[in-house]
Amino acid sequence: MRKYDAQPARSVSGAIAVPGDKSISHRSLMLSGIAEGTSEVTGFLASEDCLATLTAMRALGVHIEQPSATEVVVHGVGLRGLRDAGSALDMGNAGTAIRLFTGLLSAQSFDSQLIGDASLMKRPMERVAKPLREMGADVRTRNGTPPVDIGGGHSLRGIEFRMPVASAQVKSAVLLAALYADGATTVIAPAVNRDHSERMLASCGVQLDIEGLRTTLHPPRALANQRLNVPGDFSSAAFFIVAGLLGAAGEGLLIRNVGLNPTRTGLLDILRSMGGEIDIRNPRESGAEPVADLLVRASALRGVEMPAALVPLAIDELPVLFIAAACAAGETLVTGAEELRVKESDRIAAMSAGLESLGVAHSVLSDGMRIEGKPSGPAFSGGEIDSFGDHRIAMSFTIASLRAAKTISIRDVANVATSFPGFVGLARSVGLDVREFAA
């Protein structure tokens, strides 16, 4: 088992760039693989999750070169060119991959099976399987969780699907299946959620009609190849944004080339409403995505009630928001975040256990948390906490060391490599005192 020891650190500074966006990296491999011709991707995130997708696409017959860790060249086989992998496809810990592959493979001529690690095998899959079955797919789960068995050779039909919860993974799975359907497919979301799939499909030449929360996909004859530069992952930048707010020295902490897709940046809105000084500099476009540099300065934060509309736009960043809330003046209330309970861990329970161990006053709700902050002096006592094998829990409590009285020891951190290889080195480069070792 791997472990972090994060010593108290009082300031961070410098200029950094975070690794490429995980969501976009997954999708770049899948869409390039079923496109015509050769696609080039730079800024690719070579994390365990994305490498699981790369390995699976190769097993499905797609030739992929990797000139460097952050570059991939994908030789597309076309919409109908995937082939039987011959054995189960192992998604590792990648929830995005298993859900998107379920949609993509539901339209193929061959049978497939999707499996993963112990954590992934507990993740809910019926939310994806149900609309795909409505389209005519043969998708089977084991009591609602993986392994996922997909029968090949079924003709799919376009449907109108109203998502019961705002989930970009479910929406994307349906849209990938819809590429092969007879007739248009419409997905209606209950709230705004990530739109990377729509942006990337459009850049591949797919006709999409988008009106508010309603997205209609018209099946294409083919997907065009692309040259894609993946921006820095906002979810990875989130840890350093909060670090800068808690302890940036001098002129602040600069985070370069961060993807600022408006369906991902709810954390920016909530942190600014808490008094956070975050300047957006050099805004620009990178492919279909908005990108900018962020300058973060140390700020006196105040507790707020998080607007419900921002929750789906910040769902992966809520663990580190809880760290910021523990350092804010007054109370912070987050509700409507029940989706946290079915991530890599039950993130509400995992964060509560860590906050309890570190002496933070809080109360747990079924769909969120209420946190009483401590704006001056150490907000965290120090001690040992368990990440429950969840990368975002481990990294969030590492950031807490900026306001800790004593060392924070974090157990079970190997899964940080699923999303943020090199996290410890980057954290140390800005001034955090964190070390990784075998427990």
Go through the PLM ranges and name each one:
Residues 1-439:
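Structural preference for solvent-exposed beta-strand-turn elements
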